[in-house]
């Protein structure tokens, strides 16, 4: 929910991925 503009391209969250 916090890493949306970081690595959340098509994941929605991405914060945990990037």
Curated annotation (Swiss-Prot):
The modification N6-acetyllysine is found at residues 6, 13, 17. GO terms for molecular function: DNA binding. It is found in: Nucleus; Chromosome. The modification N-acetylserine is found at residue 2. Disulfide bonds: none annotated. The modification N6-acetyl-N6-methyllysine is found at residues 6, 13. GO terms for cellular component: nucleosome; nucleus. Keywords: Acetylation, Chromosome, DNA-binding, Methylation, Nucleosome core, Nucleus. The nucleosome is a histone octamer containing two molecules each of H2A, H2B, H3 and H4 assembled in one H3-H4 heterotetramer and two H2A-H2B heterodimers. The octamer wraps approximately 147 bp of DNA. Core component of nucleosome. Nucleosomes wrap and compact DNA into chromatin, limiting DNA accessibility to the cellular machineries which require DNA as a template. Histones thereby play a central role in transcription regulation, DNA repair, DNA replication and chromosomal stability. DNA accessibility is regulated via a complex set of post-translational modifications of histones, also called histone code, and nucleosome remodeling. Belongs to the histone H4 family. This is Histone H4. It comes from Sepia officinalis. The lineage of its organism: Eukaryota, Metazoa, Spiralia, Lophotrochozoa, Mollusca.
């Amino acid at each position: 929910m916090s890493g949306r503009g970081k690595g959340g391209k098509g994941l929605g969250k991405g914060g945990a991925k990037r």
